[in-house]
């Protein structure tokens, strides 16, 4: 089986997984994984069944928050920014399990928002993330956060490839990438680290 065939099977599986959700609220960081998940769902549903929520605080990059906001605005996807500055005391002592506590606090807040609107809360965790030590994943599992990219078996390189394909096939998504990319930045999001 070729790499393209494998990717197609995984994308078909992702579509099947997402079809099981009534509505989905994506925890949109502005990074490649959550942008891909948002783009893929948008292609399936338009803006009817998807919304995005971005956490903000002193420990988040303002340019990624602005990218997420601009991306959603361009596509007409409902987008909210949730301030999570309150978590700073949880992590200011820099404990060894700070990633767990940080994710738990942030996603506990996001889960409440998702429950208020009756949506599944999904994040951009993918199969490649399982290769690293990431204590924050335990918090996601405890909170029941959906990780459809991981469930579909998609790796980071496959996500980059699929995002590039989507941009080539869908002019609205390609336009959203271009409009929200800072001037002078010529690197497409699927190539960013």
Summary of predicted features, one role per range:
Residues 150, 154-193:
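Mid-to-C-terminal catalytic subdomains of enzymes
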Residues 1-165:
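ATP-dependent adenylation/nucleotidyltransferase module used to activate substrates
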């Amino acid at each position: 089986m070729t790499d393209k065939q494998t990717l197609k099977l995984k994308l078909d599986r992702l579509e099947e997984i997402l079809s099981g959700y009534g509505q989905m609220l994506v925890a949109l960081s502005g990074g490649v994984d959550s942008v891909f998940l948002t783009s893929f769902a948008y292609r399936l549903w338009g803006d009817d069944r998807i919304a995005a929520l971005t956490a903000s605080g002193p420990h988040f990059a303002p340019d990624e928050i602005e990218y997420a906001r601009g991306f959603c605005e361009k596509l007409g996807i409902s987008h909210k920014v949730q301030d999570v500055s309150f978590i700073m005391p949880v992590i200011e002592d820099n404990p060894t399990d700070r990633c767990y506590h940080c994710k738990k606090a942030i996603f506990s807040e996001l889960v409440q928002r998702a429950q208020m609107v009756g949506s599944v809360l999904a994040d951009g965790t993918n199969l490649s993330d399982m290769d690293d030590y990431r204590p924050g994943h335990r918090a996601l599992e405890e909170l029941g956060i959906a990780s459809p990219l991981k469930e579909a078996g998609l790796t980071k390189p496959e996500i980059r490839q699929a995002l590039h394909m989507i941009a080539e096939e869908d002019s609205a998504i390609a336009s959203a990438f271009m409009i929200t990319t800072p001037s002078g930045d010529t690197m497409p999001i699927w190539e960013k680290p």
